[in-house]
From Swiss-Prot:
One of its GO terms (molecular function) is ferredoxin-NADP+ reductase activity. Gene3D superfamilies: FAD/NAD(P)-binding domain, NAD(P)-binding Rossmann-like Domain. Belongs to the ferredoxin--NADP reductase type 1 family. It catalyses: 2 reduced [adrenodoxin] + NADP(+) + H(+) = 2 oxidized [adrenodoxin] + NADPH; 2 reduced [2Fe-2S]-[ferredoxin] + NADP(+) + H(+) = 2 oxidized [2Fe-2S]-[ferredoxin] + NADPH. This is NADPH:adrenodoxin oxidoreductase, mitochondrial. The lineage of its organism: Eukaryota, Metazoa, Chordata, Craniata, Vertebrata. The gene is FDXR. It comes from Homo sapiens (Human).
Protein backbone atom coordinates (compact mmCIF):
# COMPACT_ATOMS: atom_id res chain seq x y z
CA UNK A 1 0.00 0.00 0.00
CA UNK A 2 2.77 2.42 0.94
CA UNK A 3 4.57 1.99 -2.36
CA UNK A 4 1.35 2.59 -4.32
CA UNK A 5 0.79 5.86 -2.43
CA UNK A 6 4.38 6.86 -3.00
CA UNK A 7 4.24 6.36 -6.77
CA UNK A 8 1.03 8.36 -7.12
CA UNK A 9 2.28 11.15 -4.88
CA UNK A 10 5.33 11.73 -7.07
CA UNK A 11 3.13 12.39 -10.11
CA UNK A 12 0.30 14.24 -8.42
CA UNK A 13 -1.01 17.74 -8.88
CA UNK A 14 0.68 18.61 -5.60
CA UNK A 15 4.39 18.22 -6.53
CA UNK A 16 5.80 20.80 -4.17
CA UNK A 17 4.25 19.31 -1.05
CA UNK A 18 7.00 18.01 1.24
CA UNK A 19 7.52 14.29 0.70
CA UNK A 20 7.99 11.85 3.60
CA UNK A 21 11.55 10.78 4.49
CA UNK A 22 12.96 7.83 2.57
CA UNK A 23 11.85 4.53 4.00
CA UNK A 24 9.01 6.00 6.05
CA UNK A 25 5.30 5.35 5.54
CA UNK A 26 3.09 8.46 5.38
CA UNK A 27 0.48 8.50 8.15
CA UNK A 28 -2.37 8.97 5.68
CA UNK A 29 -1.43 5.64 4.13
CA UNK A 30 -0.94 3.89 7.43
CA UNK A 31 -4.44 4.81 8.60
CA UNK A 32 -6.06 4.15 5.24
CA UNK A 33 -8.68 1.77 6.61
CA UNK A 34 -9.74 4.15 9.41
CA UNK A 35 -10.18 7.00 7.00
CA UNK A 36 -12.16 4.95 4.52
CA UNK A 37 -14.82 3.96 7.05
CA UNK A 38 -16.63 7.30 7.14
CA UNK A 39 -14.97 9.88 4.90
CA UNK A 40 -16.35 13.34 5.59
CA UNK A 41 -16.37 15.49 2.45
CA UNK A 42 -17.72 18.97 1.90
CA UNK A 43 -18.70 20.66 -1.35
CA UNK A 44 -18.86 24.46 -1.62
CA UNK A 45 -21.63 25.53 -3.99
CA UNK A 46 -25.00 23.94 -4.77
CA UNK A 47 -25.27 24.55 -8.49
CA UNK A 48 -24.86 21.80 -11.10
CA UNK A 49 -21.14 21.39 -10.37
CA UNK A 50 -21.74 21.00 -6.64
CA UNK A 51 -24.63 18.58 -6.91
CA UNK A 52 -23.07 16.44 -9.66
CA UNK A 53 -19.84 16.21 -7.66
CA UNK A 54 -21.81 15.17 -4.57
CA UNK A 55 -23.76 12.63 -6.63
CA UNK A 56 -20.53 10.94 -7.73
CA UNK A 57 -18.97 11.05 -4.25
CA UNK A 58 -21.99 9.25 -2.82
CA UNK A 59 -21.00 6.22 -4.90
CA UNK A 60 -18.62 5.53 -2.01
CA UNK A 61 -20.83 3.44 0.30
CA UNK A 62 -19.82 5.26 3.51
CA UNK A 63 -19.01 8.79 2.35
CA UNK A 64 -20.93 11.66 3.92
CA UNK A 65 -21.20 14.83 1.84
CA UNK A 66 -22.17 18.28 3.13
CA UNK A 67 -23.04 20.92 0.51
CA UNK A 68 -22.58 24.56 1.59
CA UNK A 69 -24.34 27.38 -0.27
CA UNK A 70 -24.18 31.17 0.09
CA UNK A 71 -27.86 31.66 -0.82
CA UNK A 72 -30.64 30.33 1.44
CA UNK A 73 -31.86 28.33 -1.58
CA UNK A 74 -30.10 25.66 -3.67
CA UNK A 75 -29.42 24.96 -7.36
CA UNK A 76 -27.27 27.95 -8.38
CA UNK A 77 -27.53 28.87 -12.06
CA UNK A 78 -30.30 26.33 -12.66
CA UNK A 79 -32.48 28.61 -10.54
CA UNK A 80 -30.82 31.96 -11.21
CA UNK A 81 -29.35 31.56 -14.72
CA UNK A 82 -31.64 29.39 -16.84
CA UNK A 83 -34.17 31.52 -18.73
CA UNK A 84 -37.74 31.39 -17.34
CA UNK A 85 -39.08 30.29 -20.74
CA UNK A 86 -36.78 27.22 -20.68
CA UNK A 87 -38.44 25.20 -17.88
CA UNK A 88 -37.34 21.87 -19.37
CA UNK A 89 -33.69 22.72 -18.58
CA UNK A 90 -34.64 23.01 -14.91
CA UNK A 91 -35.73 19.37 -14.75
CA UNK A 92 -32.25 18.51 -13.45
CA UNK A 93 -33.50 19.90 -10.13
CA UNK A 94 -35.35 16.59 -9.68
CA UNK A 95 -32.04 14.70 -9.83
CA UNK A 96 -30.39 17.15 -7.43
CA UNK A 97 -33.31 16.77 -5.01
CA UNK A 98 -32.84 12.99 -5.01
CA UNK A 99 -29.17 13.51 -4.14
CA UNK A 100 -30.07 15.90 -1.31
CA UNK A 101 -32.53 13.33 0.07
CA UNK A 102 -29.75 10.78 0.52
CA UNK A 103 -29.18 9.95 4.17
CA UNK A 104 -25.48 10.63 3.59
CA UNK A 105 -25.90 14.08 2.03
CA UNK A 106 -26.85 17.37 3.68
CA UNK A 107 -27.46 20.85 2.28
CA UNK A 108 -26.55 23.91 4.35
CA UNK A 109 -27.67 27.18 2.77
CA UNK A 110 -27.18 30.74 4.04
CA UNK A 111 -23.51 29.95 4.69
CA UNK A 112 -20.97 32.04 2.79
CA UNK A 113 -17.60 30.33 2.66
CA UNK A 114 -14.85 32.93 2.96
CA UNK A 115 -17.01 35.09 5.23
CA UNK A 116 -18.99 32.89 7.65
CA UNK A 117 -16.44 30.07 7.65
CA UNK A 118 -13.00 29.84 6.04
CA UNK A 119 -11.60 27.18 3.75
CA UNK A 120 -8.88 26.25 6.32
CA UNK A 121 -11.65 25.68 8.88
CA UNK A 122 -13.45 23.40 6.42
CA UNK A 123 -10.22 21.53 5.71
CA UNK A 124 -9.76 20.94 9.45
CA UNK A 125 -13.26 19.52 9.75
CA UNK A 126 -13.35 17.33 6.61
CA UNK A 127 -11.15 14.75 4.92
CA UNK A 128 -11.58 16.61 1.63
CA UNK A 129 -13.06 19.89 0.39
CA UNK A 130 -14.39 20.48 -3.14
CA UNK A 131 -14.82 24.07 -4.38
CA UNK A 132 -17.71 24.21 -6.87
CA UNK A 133 -18.92 27.76 -6.36
CA UNK A 134 -19.08 28.77 -10.01
CA UNK A 135 -18.54 32.16 -11.62
CA UNK A 136 -20.22 34.90 -9.59
CA UNK A 137 -18.81 37.87 -11.50
CA UNK A 138 -18.76 39.17 -15.08
CA UNK A 139 -15.90 40.19 -17.31
CA UNK A 140 -15.61 43.96 -17.53
CA UNK A 141 -15.62 45.75 -20.89
CA UNK A 142 -12.78 48.01 -19.73
CA UNK A 143 -13.80 50.83 -22.06
CA UNK A 144 -14.67 54.49 -21.33
CA UNK A 145 -18.29 55.07 -20.33
CA UNK A 146 -18.81 51.60 -18.91
CA UNK A 147 -19.84 53.14 -15.59
CA UNK A 148 -22.67 55.25 -17.07
CA UNK A 149 -26.29 54.64 -16.03
CA UNK A 150 -27.93 52.51 -18.70
CA UNK A 151 -24.99 50.09 -18.84
CA UNK A 152 -25.11 46.78 -17.00
CA UNK A 153 -23.87 43.24 -17.35
CA UNK A 154 -26.07 40.61 -18.95
CA UNK A 155 -25.28 38.51 -15.89
CA UNK A 156 -26.90 41.10 -13.59
CA UNK A 157 -29.88 41.45 -15.94
CA UNK A 158 -30.40 37.66 -15.95
CA UNK A 159 -30.10 37.62 -12.16
CA UNK A 160 -32.66 40.42 -11.96
CA UNK A 161 -35.40 38.68 -13.94
CA UNK A 162 -34.59 35.30 -12.34
CA UNK A 163 -34.81 36.52 -8.75
CA UNK A 164 -31.15 36.51 -7.65
CA UNK A 165 -31.28 38.56 -4.43
CA UNK A 166 -28.16 40.63 -5.13
CA UNK A 167 -29.59 41.89 -8.45
CA UNK A 168 -33.07 42.93 -7.29
CA UNK A 169 -32.06 46.60 -7.03
CA UNK A 170 -30.97 46.73 -10.68
CA UNK A 171 -34.08 48.55 -11.98
CA UNK A 172 -33.13 48.54 -15.69
CA UNK A 173 -34.52 51.49 -17.63
CA UNK A 174 -36.39 50.04 -20.61
CA UNK A 175 -37.85 53.36 -21.75
CA UNK A 176 -35.55 53.52 -24.79
CA UNK A 177 -36.23 52.30 -28.32
CA UNK A 178 -32.96 50.42 -28.90
CA UNK A 179 -30.82 48.12 -26.75
CA UNK A 180 -27.33 46.89 -27.63
CA UNK A 181 -25.96 43.61 -26.29
CA UNK A 182 -22.19 43.26 -26.55
CA UNK A 183 -21.58 39.56 -27.12
CA UNK A 184 -23.01 36.78 -29.25
CA UNK A 185 -23.36 33.79 -26.93
CA UNK A 186 -26.38 31.97 -25.53
CA UNK A 187 -26.67 34.39 -22.60
CA UNK A 188 -26.83 37.30 -25.07
CA UNK A 189 -29.62 35.53 -26.97
CA UNK A 190 -31.47 34.79 -23.72
CA UNK A 191 -31.40 38.47 -22.80
CA UNK A 192 -32.49 39.57 -26.28
CA UNK A 193 -35.33 37.05 -26.26
CA UNK A 194 -36.60 38.17 -22.85
CA UNK A 195 -36.45 41.83 -23.94
CA UNK A 196 -38.46 41.14 -27.11
CA UNK A 197 -40.87 38.38 -26.03
CA UNK A 198 -44.45 39.63 -25.65
CA UNK A 199 -44.95 39.88 -21.85
CA UNK A 200 -48.10 37.75 -21.98
CA UNK A 201 -45.91 34.86 -23.16
CA UNK A 202 -43.90 35.12 -19.93
CA UNK A 203 -46.87 35.30 -17.56
CA UNK A 204 -46.92 31.55 -16.92
CA UNK A 205 -43.18 31.20 -16.31
CA UNK A 206 -41.27 31.64 -13.05
CA UNK A 207 -39.98 35.10 -14.01
CA UNK A 208 -40.26 37.42 -11.02
CA UNK A 209 -43.35 39.55 -10.58
CA UNK A 210 -41.25 42.73 -10.46
CA UNK A 211 -39.38 41.90 -13.69
CA UNK A 212 -42.60 41.06 -15.52
CA UNK A 213 -44.04 44.42 -14.45
CA UNK A 214 -41.03 46.29 -15.86
CA UNK A 215 -41.09 44.28 -19.11
CA UNK A 216 -44.78 45.11 -19.57
CA UNK A 217 -43.83 48.81 -19.61
CA UNK A 218 -40.82 48.30 -21.90
CA UNK A 219 -40.49 50.49 -25.00
CA UNK A 220 -37.56 48.53 -26.43
CA UNK A 221 -38.33 47.71 -30.07
CA UNK A 222 -34.91 46.82 -31.47
CA UNK A 223 -32.07 44.77 -30.00
CA UNK A 224 -28.63 44.56 -31.63
CA UNK A 225 -26.19 41.79 -30.70
CA UNK A 226 -22.64 42.89 -31.46
CA UNK A 227 -19.65 40.59 -32.00
CA UNK A 228 -15.98 41.24 -32.77
CA UNK A 229 -15.76 38.35 -35.23
CA UNK A 230 -18.00 36.87 -37.93
CA UNK A 231 -20.86 34.41 -38.43
CA UNK A 232 -18.53 31.40 -38.27
CA UNK A 233 -17.37 32.37 -34.77
CA UNK A 234 -20.65 33.03 -32.95
CA UNK A 235 -20.83 31.34 -29.54
CA UNK A 236 -24.58 30.66 -29.41
CA UNK A 237 -26.12 27.32 -30.41
CA UNK A 238 -28.70 26.44 -33.04
CA UNK A 239 -31.57 25.85 -30.59
CA UNK A 240 -31.32 29.37 -29.21
CA UNK A 241 -30.92 30.88 -32.69
CA UNK A 242 -34.00 29.05 -33.97
CA UNK A 243 -36.03 30.42 -31.03
CA UNK A 244 -34.97 33.96 -31.95
CA UNK A 245 -35.83 33.52 -35.63
CA UNK A 246 -39.30 32.23 -34.70
CA UNK A 247 -39.91 34.74 -31.88
CA UNK A 248 -43.53 36.00 -32.04
CA UNK A 249 -43.82 39.65 -33.02
CA UNK A 250 -40.13 40.03 -33.91
CA UNK A 251 -38.19 39.89 -37.16
CA UNK A 252 -34.47 39.22 -37.75
CA UNK A 253 -32.12 41.76 -39.36
CA UNK A 254 -29.05 40.19 -40.96
CA UNK A 255 -26.84 41.86 -43.57
CA UNK A 256 -26.20 39.52 -46.54
CA UNK A 257 -22.81 41.20 -47.04
CA UNK A 258 -21.59 39.59 -43.79
CA UNK A 259 -22.17 36.17 -45.35
CA UNK A 260 -20.37 36.61 -48.69
CA UNK A 261 -18.12 33.65 -49.47
CA UNK A 262 -19.35 31.71 -46.46
CA UNK A 263 -21.00 28.93 -48.46
CA UNK A 264 -17.62 27.48 -49.46
CA UNK A 265 -16.04 27.90 -46.02
CA UNK A 266 -18.69 25.94 -44.13
CA UNK A 267 -18.01 22.74 -46.09
CA UNK A 268 -15.03 21.94 -43.85
CA UNK A 269 -16.44 22.89 -40.43
CA UNK A 270 -17.85 20.38 -37.89
CA UNK A 271 -21.50 19.44 -38.42
CA UNK A 272 -23.05 21.42 -35.49
CA UNK A 273 -21.24 24.58 -36.61
CA UNK A 274 -22.20 23.89 -40.23
CA UNK A 275 -25.92 23.54 -39.40
CA UNK A 276 -25.84 26.71 -37.32
CA UNK A 277 -24.11 28.73 -40.04
CA UNK A 278 -26.43 27.38 -42.73
CA UNK A 279 -29.43 28.57 -40.71
CA UNK A 280 -27.86 32.03 -40.39
CA UNK A 281 -27.07 32.03 -44.10
CA UNK A 282 -30.62 31.07 -45.12
CA UNK A 283 -32.12 33.68 -42.81
CA UNK A 284 -29.83 36.40 -44.18
CA UNK A 285 -30.00 35.63 -47.89
CA UNK A 286 -33.14 33.68 -48.79
CA UNK A 287 -36.49 35.30 -49.47
CA UNK A 288 -38.98 34.07 -46.85
CA UNK A 289 -42.11 32.19 -47.90
CA UNK A 290 -45.49 33.97 -47.91
CA UNK A 291 -46.45 33.02 -44.34
CA UNK A 292 -43.07 34.00 -42.89
CA UNK A 293 -42.98 37.19 -44.96
CA UNK A 294 -46.41 38.15 -43.61
CA UNK A 295 -45.29 37.39 -40.05
CA UNK A 296 -42.19 39.53 -40.42
CA UNK A 297 -44.14 42.36 -42.05
CA UNK A 298 -46.51 42.53 -39.08
CA UNK A 299 -43.73 42.35 -36.48
CA UNK A 300 -43.45 45.41 -34.25
CA UNK A 301 -40.03 44.47 -32.89
CA UNK A 302 -36.71 43.44 -34.41
CA UNK A 303 -33.34 41.98 -33.50
CA UNK A 304 -30.12 41.91 -35.48
CA UNK A 305 -26.57 40.58 -35.44
CA UNK A 306 -23.77 43.09 -36.05
CA UNK A 307 -20.57 41.27 -36.98
CA UNK A 308 -16.97 42.52 -37.18
CA UNK A 309 -17.50 45.26 -34.58
CA UNK A 310 -15.53 45.81 -31.37
CA UNK A 311 -16.78 48.21 -28.64
CA UNK A 312 -14.44 51.13 -27.94
CA UNK A 313 -16.57 53.48 -25.85
CA UNK A 314 -20.05 53.87 -24.38
CA UNK A 315 -21.21 57.26 -25.60
CA UNK A 316 -22.89 59.57 -23.06
CA UNK A 317 -26.09 61.53 -23.58
CA UNK A 318 -25.66 65.32 -24.15
CA UNK A 319 -26.07 65.98 -20.42
CA UNK A 320 -23.58 63.20 -19.62
CA UNK A 321 -26.01 61.47 -17.29
CA UNK A 322 -26.60 58.19 -19.11
CA UNK A 323 -25.63 55.96 -22.02
CA UNK A 324 -26.76 57.09 -25.47
CA UNK A 325 -24.83 54.80 -27.80
CA UNK A 326 -21.76 52.66 -28.41
CA UNK A 327 -18.74 53.56 -30.51
CA UNK A 328 -17.62 50.50 -32.46
CA UNK A 329 -14.35 49.77 -34.24
CA UNK A 330 -14.86 47.94 -37.53
CA UNK A 331 -12.75 44.76 -37.55
CA UNK A 332 -11.48 42.15 -39.98
CA UNK A 333 -10.37 38.60 -39.30
CA UNK A 334 -6.76 37.41 -39.31
CA UNK A 335 -5.50 33.86 -38.80
CA UNK A 336 -7.26 30.56 -39.38
CA UNK A 337 -9.45 28.19 -37.37
CA UNK A 338 -8.99 28.54 -33.59
CA UNK A 339 -6.34 31.25 -34.07
CA UNK A 340 -8.77 33.54 -35.90
CA UNK A 341 -8.79 36.95 -34.25
CA UNK A 342 -10.42 40.30 -34.93
CA UNK A 343 -8.15 43.24 -35.70
CA UNK A 344 -9.33 46.85 -36.17
CA UNK A 345 -9.40 48.28 -39.69
CA UNK A 346 -9.21 51.88 -38.47
CA UNK A 347 -12.84 52.64 -39.30
CA UNK A 348 -15.34 53.57 -36.59
CA UNK A 349 -19.11 53.78 -36.36
CA UNK A 350 -21.56 54.87 -33.69
CA UNK A 351 -24.62 52.80 -32.79
CA UNK A 352 -27.26 54.85 -30.92
CA UNK A 353 -29.08 53.12 -28.06
CA UNK A 354 -30.40 53.78 -24.57
CA UNK A 355 -29.43 50.46 -22.96
CA UNK A 356 -26.10 48.62 -23.15
CA UNK A 357 -25.78 45.07 -21.85
CA UNK A 358 -22.33 43.51 -21.62
CA UNK A 359 -22.35 39.77 -22.33
CA UNK A 360 -18.69 38.92 -22.86
CA UNK A 361 -18.43 36.20 -20.23
CA UNK A 362 -18.73 35.27 -16.58
CA UNK A 363 -15.77 35.23 -14.21
CA UNK A 364 -15.00 33.41 -10.96
CA UNK A 365 -13.77 35.18 -7.85
CA UNK A 366 -11.20 33.98 -5.32
CA UNK A 367 -13.04 32.52 -2.32
CA UNK A 368 -10.35 32.55 0.37
CA UNK A 369 -6.75 33.83 0.64
CA UNK A 370 -5.59 30.28 1.39
CA UNK A 371 -6.78 28.98 -2.00
CA UNK A 372 -4.57 29.47 -5.09
CA UNK A 373 -6.30 31.52 -7.77
CA UNK A 374 -5.33 32.49 -11.32
CA UNK A 375 -6.85 35.96 -11.63
CA UNK A 376 -5.98 36.19 -15.34
CA UNK A 377 -7.85 33.00 -16.28
CA UNK A 378 -10.37 33.32 -13.45
CA UNK A 379 -9.91 29.73 -12.28
CA UNK A 380 -8.36 27.77 -9.43
CA UNK A 381 -5.13 26.17 -10.76
CA UNK A 382 -5.71 22.42 -10.83
CA UNK A 383 -4.91 19.15 -12.52
CA UNK A 384 -8.04 17.07 -13.17
CA UNK A 385 -9.73 18.83 -10.26
CA UNK A 386 -6.88 18.47 -7.75
CA UNK A 387 -5.95 21.98 -6.58
CA UNK A 388 -2.27 22.64 -7.18
CA UNK A 389 -0.09 22.33 -4.07
CA UNK A 390 -3.00 21.86 -1.64
CA UNK A 391 -3.56 18.15 -0.89
CA UNK A 392 -7.16 17.34 0.01
CA UNK A 393 -8.54 20.38 -1.84
CA UNK A 394 -10.40 19.92 -5.13
CA UNK A 395 -12.51 21.96 -7.55
CA UNK A 396 -15.19 21.30 -10.17
CA UNK A 397 -17.33 23.22 -12.65
CA UNK A 398 -16.66 26.74 -13.88
CA UNK A 399 -14.18 27.62 -11.14
CA UNK A 400 -12.17 24.61 -12.33
CA UNK A 401 -12.25 25.04 -16.11
CA UNK A 402 -13.70 28.50 -16.80
CA UNK A 403 -17.29 29.60 -17.56
CA UNK A 404 -17.99 27.53 -20.66
CA UNK A 405 -20.26 24.69 -21.64
CA UNK A 406 -23.78 23.59 -20.81
CA UNK A 407 -25.09 21.63 -17.82
CA UNK A 408 -24.09 18.30 -19.41
CA UNK A 409 -20.49 19.57 -19.75
CA UNK A 410 -20.47 20.43 -16.06
CA UNK A 411 -21.84 16.99 -15.19
CA UNK A 412 -18.96 15.22 -16.96
CA UNK A 413 -16.41 17.60 -15.46
CA UNK A 414 -17.81 17.18 -11.93
CA UNK A 415 -17.93 13.40 -12.17
CA UNK A 416 -14.23 13.48 -13.10
CA UNK A 417 -13.35 15.53 -10.01
CA UNK A 418 -15.39 13.15 -7.86
CA UNK A 419 -13.59 10.20 -9.43
CA UNK A 420 -10.16 11.73 -8.68
CA UNK A 421 -11.14 12.36 -5.06
CA UNK A 422 -12.38 8.79 -4.56
CA UNK A 423 -9.18 7.47 -6.16
CA UNK A 424 -7.11 9.52 -3.72
CA UNK A 425 -9.25 8.31 -0.85
CA UNK A 426 -8.74 4.69 -1.86
CA UNK A 427 -4.99 5.25 -2.24
CA UNK A 428 -4.79 6.68 1.28
CA UNK A 429 -3.69 10.11 0.12
CA UNK A 430 -6.14 12.10 2.23
CA UNK A 431 -5.84 12.98 5.94
CA UNK A 432 -6.08 10.01 8.29
CA UNK A 433 -8.29 9.42 11.28
CA UNK A 434 -11.87 10.55 11.92
CA UNK A 435 -12.98 14.10 11.14
CA UNK A 436 -15.91 15.87 12.83
CA UNK A 437 -17.47 17.21 9.62
CA UNK A 438 -20.56 19.39 10.05
CA UNK A 439 -20.57 19.11 13.86
CA UNK A 440 -17.44 21.28 14.05
CA UNK A 441 -18.68 23.75 11.44
CA UNK A 442 -22.10 24.02 13.09
CA UNK A 443 -20.43 25.06 16.34
CA UNK A 444 -18.38 27.71 14.53
CA UNK A 445 -21.41 29.07 12.69
CA UNK A 446 -23.50 29.15 15.85
CA UNK A 447 -20.79 31.13 17.66
CA UNK A 448 -20.83 33.61 14.76
CA UNK A 449 -24.59 34.04 14.70
CA UNK A 450 -25.08 32.24 11.38
CA UNK A 451 -28.19 30.06 11.04
CA UNK A 452 -27.89 27.56 8.19
CA UNK A 453 -30.87 26.59 6.06
CA UNK A 454 -31.36 22.83 5.65
CA UNK A 455 -32.81 21.08 2.62
CA UNK A 456 -36.07 20.47 4.48
CA UNK A 457 -36.13 24.23 5.18
CA UNK A 458 -35.72 24.82 1.45
CA UNK A 459 -38.65 22.50 0.75
CA UNK A 460 -40.82 24.72 2.96
CA UNK A 461 -39.72 27.76 0.93
CA UNK A 462 -40.32 25.79 -2.26
CA UNK A 463 -43.89 25.00 -1.17
CA UNK A 464 -44.46 28.68 -0.33
CA UNK A 465 -43.23 29.77 -3.77
CA UNK A 466 -45.46 27.23 -5.53
CA UNK A 467 -48.47 28.33 -3.46
CA UNK A 468 -47.85 31.99 -4.30
CA UNK A 469 -47.65 31.18 -8.01
CA UNK A 470 -50.89 29.21 -8.14
CA UNK A 471 -53.09 32.28 -7.91
CA UNK A 472 -51.69 33.70 -11.15
CA UNK A 473 -51.11 30.46 -13.05
CA UNK A 474 -47.34 30.51 -12.58
CA UNK A 475 -45.29 27.43 -11.59
CA UNK A 476 -43.98 29.50 -8.67
CA UNK A 477 -43.53 33.07 -7.50
CA UNK A 478 -39.91 33.23 -6.42
CA UNK A 479 -38.95 34.64 -3.05
CA UNK A 480 -36.27 37.23 -3.75
CA UNK A 481 -35.49 38.62 -0.27
CA UNK A 482 -33.23 36.43 1.91
CA UNK A 483 -34.53 38.13 5.05
CA UNK A 484 -38.10 37.22 4.14
CA UNK A 485 -36.98 33.63 3.51
CA UNK A 486 -35.37 33.43 6.94
CA UNK A 487 -38.45 34.99 8.59
CA UNK A 488 -40.70 32.40 6.95
CA UNK A 489 -38.46 29.70 8.43
CA UNK A 490 -38.45 31.30 11.87
CA UNK A 491 -34.70 31.92 11.73
Amino acid sequence: MASRCWRWWGWSAWPRTRLPPAGSTPSFCHHFSTQEKTPQICVVGSGPAGFYTAQHLLKHPQAHVDIYEKQPVPFGLVRFGVAPDHPEVKNVINTFTQTAHSGRCAFWGNVEVGRDVTVPELREAYHAVVLSYGAEDHRALEIPGEELPGVCSARAFVGWYNGLPENQELEPDLSCDTAVILGQGNVALDVARILLTPPEHLERTDITKAALGVLRQSRVKTVWLVGRRGPLQVAFTIKELREMIQLPGARPILDPVDFLGLQDKIKEVPRPRKRLTELLLRTATEKPGPAEAARQASASRAWGLRFFRSPQQVLPSPDGRRAAGVRLAVTRLEGVDEATRAVPTGDMEDLPCGLVLSSIGYKSRPVDPSVPFDSKLGVIPNVEGRVMDVPGLYCSGWVKRGPTGVIATTMTDSFLTGQMLLQDLKAGLLPSGPRPGYAAIQALLSSRGVRPVSFSDWEKLDAEEVARGQGTGKPREKLVDPQEMLRLLGH
